[in-house]
């Protein structure tokens, strides 16, 4: 029987620590994704992070998918993360982290203040481009 992602998670963590040459004792904080995203995947990640936090006696902190995707970006950015039923979770960054859920098609009105034309394209970060949607 093949191992699933949940069963492989701790092996992947071990491999990442080995490649980075970091001992578990040096870990000071566990950071875990809290969504939006696949519900089962988020639950597995939270359970694994909580287990690591307890076993290593270190604090745990959650970060949402938009904060993780857009971390370190200074300009106006958009993340579009696929959701179920042909929906996307849209998130923007321009000093805050607003999140919106919209069907494929026109973007929420909150994007009206985005940069226009080439400046918008240059500064755009879109995730989940496997589906078509319009930001006009």
Regions found by a protein language model. Give the residues of each.
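DPxDG-like acidic metal-binding loop motif
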Residues: 29-60
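Short active-site-proximal "capping" loops at secondary-structure junctions
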Residues: 2-4, 35, 122
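Generic helix-packing signal
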Residues: 20, 52-53, 73, 129
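Short amphipathic alpha-helical face segments that pack within enzyme cores
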Residues: 8-11, 47, 51, 68
């Amino acid at each position: 029987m093949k191992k699933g992602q949940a069963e492989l998670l701790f092996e992947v963590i071990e491999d990442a620590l080995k490649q980075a040459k970091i001992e578990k004792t040096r870990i000071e904080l566990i950071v875990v994704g809290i969504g939006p995203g696949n519900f089962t995947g988020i639950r597995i990640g939270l359970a694994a992070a909580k287990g690591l936090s307890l076993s290593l006696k270190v604090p745990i902190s959650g970060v949402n998918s938009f904060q993780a995707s857009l971390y370190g970006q200074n300009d106006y950015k958009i993340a579009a993360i696929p959701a179920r039923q042909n929906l996307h979770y849209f998130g923007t960054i321009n000093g805050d982290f607003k999140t919106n859920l919209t069907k494929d098609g026109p973007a929420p009105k909150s994007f009206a203040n985005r940069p226009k034309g080439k400046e918008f394209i240059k500064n755009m970060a879109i995730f989940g481009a496997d589906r078509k949607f319009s930001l006009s």
